[in-house]
């Protein structure tokens, strides 16, 4: 009996941790239309402006949102500077990053691995934009999902080139 009690004591912290992870709130929001860029960028700023943080971005072809919403993208860069929010951005080889005022660091991956639908990871959130007619924005709000995407980003960041 004592052996069983000891073995339960050993696994109890792991079970408690799993139970807490299962309780993490999860929500999925979808948007469509011409305002998805404004909604996406505003949500990033609103999430990180108080506590700070970093935005991890994959598959960003920055010319697309810039062409569609120049004013909104310029405001986003001003907000990054004002609220001291940093970005790490993965773009395709041959592209140049748009932001060069110290807010963003860029790395590049070969074009054959590039997917034109951007993913942004920030706080406990993950965004995906699907370009089309209309454009779509999907926001997943969950710490575990965000952490999972963060790990994938770090793997890709480590493999991407600085030049």
Where are each of the predicted segments found?
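Surface-exposed cleft-lining segments at the edges of enzyme active sites
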Residues: 26-30, 62-63
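Intrinsically disordered, low-complexity polar regions and short flexible loop motifs
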Residues: 33
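Hydrophobic protein-protein interaction segments
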Residues: 36-141, 145
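Signature of lipid phosphatidyltransferase scaffolds
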Residues: 136-163
